[in-house]
UniProtKB/Swiss-Prot annotation:
Highly expressed in lung and weakly in thymus and cerebellum. Little or no expression in liver, heart and cerebral cortex. All isoforms are expressed in lung, but KL2A and KL2B isoforms are the principal isoforms in cerebellum. It is a lipid-anchor; GPI-like-anchor. The RII-alpha binding site, predicted to form an amphipathic helix, could participate in protein-protein interactions with a complementary surface on the R-subunit dimer. Binds to regulatory subunit (RII) of protein kinase A. May be involved in establishing polarity in signaling systems or in integrating PKA-RII isoforms with downstream effectors to capture, amplify and focus diffuse, trans-cellular signals carried by cAMP. Binds tp and modulates the structure of the actin cytoskeleton. Keywords: Cell membrane, Coiled coil, Glycoprotein, GPI-anchor, Isopeptide bond, Lipoprotein, Membrane, Phosphoprotein, Ubl conjugation. The modification Phosphoserine is found at S318, S348, S553, S678, S682, S734, S847, S936, S964, S995, S1002. One of its GO terms (molecular function) is protein kinase A binding. This is PALM2-AKAP2 fusion protein. There is a cross-link at K370 (Glycyl lysine isopeptide (Lys-Gly) (interchain with G-Cter in SUMO1)).
Length: 1089
């Protein structure tokens, strides 16, 4: 009982000591953390001080903040220092308590060892009677010896545990797991004397008591040394005590192991580690333990008794070490698992050193493994064994893997299955993949992938390609045939020569029989060489011809493709005449184009609002048809376009740009529809839906004129051609011209946009065609650049053409008045060149603003009119009778401005290349890329607004200065009168169309002021610019300070309906105002020059 109490006290002391140790560890951690924080804070303070040294003194607040920060840092540093000192003191206190507890524990251990001595005596007596108890004592002694290398006696072993406990405490505080090292050194350190001393007992005991150590003894041992599970003879007496104590000791050992590295042997000693509860738990009859032990016992006995004690000691220490290890934690549970197997209890993992105990050890290790996974010693042993086993396995596996070879077929199948599995998984994640895998994408032909629009071009491209290939093949075949023929001819010639030579040789041979053979041979050699040379020459020439043919074909193709691009701007002019004629059929419904243009003669009267329209249409009936064909030709065929554009450029007058203002009355909607289709073709759905409708169209008309002048670099066109185009835009011709360039794009939309175009035509159908044609096709950059060139060119052209325009104006004055009256008649007659002229006059009539313009800028309207009439009449005339004539006529003006148009073309070529084919097809006006249309539309609207302002100003000026009755009548017949009166400054080269002129007047009155304004808008940018300039001039004369905004407001009043229909106001931004101001200033400067 005393023993049990001692064990309990010891356990309590151990628990308290462990508690102190954990507290010390925690404090040390805190201390480390505090030290780190202190170091960090100090470094931070130093860094801040260092950084602040070079900082200039800041505001008081900043200084205060810095000071507070430094104070806070210093305070933190002080706090940390205080904490560190406090923790150090606490750690010292805990360590002192721990030392006291450890001393107490040592005292208890000494007492326990004293009691153990008595048990040992008993065990010795038992061992003599029944070796089991002796064996257990030997094991216990062995444990003591292993634990204490110093102890030589059993007493010493008893004393050693306290020492070991101290060592263990130190180790635990250091968290060092040196148990293994200590056990081994202990065993090894045992002097032979010690070994012999203990072995003496161990030999006798081992022999006698393999696993039957007396339980009480086991108790003692278990407490200090884990006596191996001792089912000693005394088990009955001390069974209960042993069980309780052993369990407590086991618990403590487990706790110690868990908390510390009790795996060390010291742990076992201190923790009474394996109190191998087994000793008590393994209680069994003395016989049974003996029997259980007998298996291993015989060996032990044999080894112990027979083997010299030294050997036995060597093994027993190992066993003891093993037991000690078990005590550390391995064997704590072993005894319970090994109930009845007293041998197993003694056999600790370490006992594996002895072959006999190894089996026991193996068993024990299994049991210990179950409960003692935390033991490092055991883990160490496990590492050894499993590592070996694992290495062996690896070797085996490697060998096995080498052998593992599947047949290629099986591998292929497995690979297929693997891929299918991967596919199935991938399909789950991305079902779209399934379509690709399971239904591999059947390569779609290009035709299936392309849209309808592109499909047609692709087919044409393929056809061209096939044609080229066929042509090349044919050429090759022809060349080959020629070569063959040449070769045959050469062969024949050679044969003839040979025959001749043979004859000669024969003659020679007859005459000179001796020399004949040599001569013949010689001749033959010559012939052969000749043949070779000839064939080479033939091959060379054939190849050269073939190469030339290929080059020619390539050049022609390249020319055909590149021409539209090169003349992208000129086609602009050309389209005015040529394109219009070709494209109106395309853009307008081709059938209707011809019919409509023809009807234009009759409709021209109706279109008196758009006298230009009637003129161009009437002209369009004949010339427009011709022009349409020409346009279609040039546009449909890039090569054709190129020539047409060239012709236009050559036509000095951009009148060929049939800017016949087609101010179509509502009744003329048929024509307007056709034109609107063409115009609408120009207009994109976005443009139509942009709320710009009529206004947009009008602005677009101006834009078309501007773009015509700009894109064409149509400085001439801008005035004559542009003004003409403005009216032309109204007229089918102008519409067709402008829209025709656009027709490719607008063909489809033209019909859809007919309504819009009609509204445009009402407000200035001409504008839709020109605007539509221009705005979509013309690139904004081109417009801008061309606009600059055009403005300059306009000034120059105006100066040059003022005379012409004046002459034309005088002609137009009479002709236009007549055409206005006879516009309808001219409309019918318009098919001829005269009709376009007449129609041009009506467009002038149709734009009352033009009249005002004419009055204010008399030069411009007159010139415009003259140019219009000339242009439309010439282009239509040329178009009907000869498209080139129109082109040529245009070239004269174009000749003057050709440099501008060419420059503009060159500038626009790069940007247009992408969209050029379609845009160019549409005509010079279609040089704009669709992306730029919005900008161009804005510019157009701005120009339209400017034109409206100018119209208002002109109206005022007309009222004030009514230059002539025509001018007064101009409001009713704005375009005609305006054109007449604008003669002096305008570049219009009007070839008065007598009959259209008659129609013009009648159309003019019909044209509403809106249409007149629209007609004005269709005027070329040059016209509008000149009119604006004149208006500004008049403003200066009148000292009118109306800002462009106020003038816009006035124009809004005049054209309130148009403004309501459109959203021009939203376009009036500061930039727009500045832009307008810039245009006026530039014009003024130019005029002043």
């Amino acid at each position: 009982m005393a023993e049990a109490e001692l064990h309990k006290e010891r356990l309590q002391a151990i628990a308290e000591k462990r508690k102190r140790q954990t507290e010390i560890e925690g404090k040390r951690r805190q201390l480390d953390e505090q030290v780190l924080l202190l170091q960090h804070s100090k470094s931070k303070v130093l860094r801040e001080k260092w950084l602040l040294q070079g900082v200039p003194a800041g505001t008081a607040e900043e200084e205060e903040a810095r000071r507070r920060q430094s104070e806070e840092d210093e305070f933190k540093v002080k706090q940390l220092e205080d904490n560190i000192q406090r923790l150090e003191q606490e750690i010292q206190a805990l360590e002192s308590e721990e030392s006291q507890i450890s001393a107490k524990e040592q005292i208890i251990l000494e007492k326990l060892k004293e009691t153990e001595k008595s048990f040992k005596d008993l065990q010795k007596s038992f061992s003599t009677a029944d070796g089991a108890s002796g064996w257990s004592t030997v094991l216990l002694q062995g444990d003591e010896l292993t634990a204490d290398p110093i102890g030589t006696n059993a007493d010493m072993a008893i004393q050693k545990p306290p020492q070991l406990s101290e060592d263990a405490n130190q180790l635990r505080s250091k968290q060092d797991n040196c148990g293994d090292s200590r056990l081994e050194p202990a065993a090894s350190s045992l002097s032979p004397d010690h070994k012999n001393m203990e072995i003496g007992v161990s030999v006798a005991e081992c022999k006698s008591v393999p696993g039957v150590t007396s339980t009480p003894h086991s108790k003692d041992h278990s407490s200090p040394f884990y006596s191996p599970s001792h089912n000693g003879l005394l088990a009955d007496h001390h069974e209960s005590l042993d069980n309780d104590v052993a369990r407590e000791i086991q618990y403590l050992d487990e706790v110690l192991e868990a908390n510390c590295c009790d795996s060390s042997v010291d742990g076992t000693y201190n923790g009474i580690s394996s109190p191998e509860p087994g000793a008590a738990i393994l209680v069994s009859s003395l016989g049974s333990p003996a029997h259980s032990v007998t298996e291993a016992e015989p060996t032990e006995k044999a080894s112990g008794r027979q083997v010299p004690p030294h050997i036995e000691l060597s093994r027993s220490p190992s066993d003891r070490m093993a037991e000690g290890e078990r005590a550390n934690g391995h064997s704590t549970d072993q005894p319970q698992d090994l109930l009845g197997n007293s041998l197993q209890a003694p056999a600790s993992p370490s006992s594996s050193t002895s072959s006999h105990c190894s089996s026991r050890d193996g068993e024990f290790t299994l049991t210990t493994l179950k409960k003692e996974a935390k033991f490092e010693l055991r883990a160490f042993h496990e590492d050894k064994k499993p590592s070996k086993l694992f290495e062996e396995d690896e070797r085996e596996k490697e060998q096995f893997c080498v052998r593992k070879v599947r047949p290629s077929e099986e591998m292929i199948e497995l690979e297929k299955e693997r891929r299918e599995l991967i596919r199935s998984q991938a399909v789950k994640k991305n079902p779209g993949i399934a379509a690709k895998w399971w239904n591999p994408p059947q390569e779609k032909t290009i035709e299936e992938q392309l849209d309808e629009e592109h499909l047609e071009s692709h087919r044409k491209y393929k056809e061209r390609k096939e044609k080229r290939a066929q042509q090349e093949q044919l050429q090759l075949q022809q060349q080959q045939q020629q070569q063959l023929q040449q070769q045959q001819l050469q062969q024949q010639q050679l044969q003839q020569q040979q025959l001749q030579q043979q004859l000669q040789q024969q003659q020679l041979s007859t005459s000179q029989p001796c020399t004949a053979p040599a001569a013949h041979k010689h001749l033959d050699g010559i012939e052969h060489t000749k043949e070779d040379v000839v064939t080479e020459q033939i091959d060379f020439s054939a190849a050269r011809k073939q190469f030339q043919l290929m080059e020619n074909s390539r050049q022609t193709l390249a020319k055909g493709q590149s021409t539209p691009r090169l003349f992208s701007i000129k086609p602009y002019y050309k389209p005015l005449g040529s394109i219009h004629s070709d494209k109106p059929p395309t853009i307008l419904r081709p059938a209707t184009v011809g019919g409509t243009l023809e009807d234009g003669g009759t409709q021209a009267a109706k279109e008196q609002k758009a006298p230009c329209v009637s003129e161009s249409q009437s002209a369009g009936a004949g010339p427009a048809n011709a022009a349409t064909q020409g346009k279609e030709g040039p546009y449909s065929e890039p090569s054709k376009r190129g020539p047409l554009s060239k012709l236009w450029a050559e036509d000095g007058e951009f009148t060929s740009a049939r800017a016949v203002l087609t101010v179509v009355k509502d009744e003329d909607h048929g024509i307007l529809d056709q034109f609107s289709r063409s115009v609408n073709v120009s207009l994109t759905q976005e443009e139509l839906d942009s709320g710009l409708d009529e206004l947009s169209v009008r602005s677009q008309d101006t834009t078309v004129l501007e773009t015509l002048s700009n894109d064409f670099s149509m400085d001439n066109i801008s005035d004559s051609g542009a003004s003409n185009e403005t009216p032309s835009a109204l007229q089918e011709n102008s519409l067709a011209d402008f829209s025709l360039p656009q027709t490719p794009q607008t063909d489809n939309p033209s019909e859809g946009r007919e309504g819009v175009s009609k509204s445009f035509s009402d407000h200035g159908f001409y504008s839709p065609s020109s605007t539509l044609g221009d705005s979509p096709s013309v690139d904004d950059p081109l417009e801008y650049q061309a606009g600059l060139l055009v403005q300059n060119a306009i000034q120059q052209a105006i100066a040059e053409q003022v005379d012409k325009a004046e002459a034309h104006t005088s002609k137009e004055g009479s002709e236009q008045q007549e055409p206005e009256a006879t516009v309808e008649e001219a409309g019918s007659q318009t098919p001829g060149s005269e009709k376009p002229q007449g129609m041009f006059a009506p467009p002038q009539v149709s734009s009352p603003v033009q009249e005002k313009r004419d009055i204010l800028p008399k030069n411009l309207p007159a010139e415009d009119r003259a140019l219009r009439e000339k242009g439309p009449s010439q282009p239509p005339t040329a178009a009907q009778p000869s498209g080139p004539v129109n082109m040529e006529e245009t070239r004269p003006e174009g000749g003057y401005f050709s440099k501008y148009s060419e420059a503009a073309e060159l500038r626009s070529t790069a940007s247009l290349l992408a969209t050029q084919e379609s845009d160019v097809m549409v005509g010079p006006f279609k040089l704009r890329s669709r992306k730029q249309r919005t900008l161009s539309m804005i510019e157009e609207e701005i120009r339209a607004a400017q034109e409206r302002e100018e119209e208002l100003k002109r109206q005022r000026q007309v009222r004030q200065s009514t230059p002539s009755p025509r001018a007064k009548n101009a409001p009713s017949l704005p375009s005609r009168t305006t054109c007449y009166k604008t003669a002096p400054g305008k570049i219009e080269k009007v070839k008065p169309p007598p009959s259209p002129t008659t129609e013009g007047p009648s159309l003019q009155p019909d044209l509403a002021p809106e249409e007149a304004a629209g007609t004005q808008r269709p005027k070329n940018l040059m016209q509008t610019l000149m009119e604006d300039y004149e208006t500004h001039k008049s403003k200066r004369r009148e000292r009118m300070d109306d800002s462009s905004y106020t003038s816009k407001l006035l124009s809004c009043k005049v054209t309130s309906e148009v403004l309501e229909a459109t959203r021009v106001n939203r376009r009036k931004s500061a930039l727009a105002l500045r832009w307008e101001a810039g245009i006026y200033a530039n014009q003024e400067e130019e005029d002043n020059e």
